[in-house]
Amino acid sequence: MFSRERLDSKLFRIVPMEENDYESVAEIFEQGIRGGNATYDLRASDWVIWDDKHLKHSRFVVKLMETNAVVGWLALSGVSSRAVFVGVAELSIYIHQDFVGKGLGDALMIHGIASSEDHGVWTLQSGIFPENVGSIRLHEKHGFRMVGYRERLGQMQSGEWRDIVLLERRSTRVGV
């Protein structure tokens, strides 16, 4: 069992994600898939597909100072190709299972929200399985609010239908 004590901020840094970080990003995403409460996806995509799906700005990884290991990441995806929604993005955040509850999600959220606003994003949204209480709490702590509950939105490969809690954060700096 690992400790849930917050990691001293001197022990990690948050940096823009680069292509050479993607192997670790994909491994952390695969942990989320195996955990069963993070995504509908069955596997991580390759870099080219992932890179195409996500906005080029507001991509961050958490790296440990001592080893340079990637232990968390955050990225945004556009929600529509329509011009009126250019300032709306979906936020994805994943933390390595050994580092959950240590404050890395907080640090990533602060960076991700600030960067999104610097790039003109006025609304962030996230769809989260209701069983993923930790992620819901993290989002709420950073100003997201529940705006909907989508029942049986997607069917898992096992045949199980899963609900989604829709959370949204409206910027107080952009589009006000």
For the regions a language model picked out, list residue spans one by one.
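Conserved acetyl-CoA-binding loop-helix of GNAT-fold acetyltransferases
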Residues: 101-114, 137-141
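A short beta-loop-alpha structural element at the N-terminal edge
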Residues: 11-25
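Conserved GNAT-fold acetyl-CoA-binding loop/helix
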Residues: 22, 26-52
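Conserved GNAT acetyl-CoA-binding A-motif
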Residues: 116-128
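Conserved catalytic-core motifs of GNAT/GCN5-like acyltransferases
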Residues: 75-78, 125-128, 140, 145-162
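Conserved beta-strand-loop-alpha-helix junction that forms the acyl-donor binding cleft
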Residues: 100, 126-136
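Acetyl-CoA-dependent GNAT
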Residues: 42-98, 109-110, 170-172
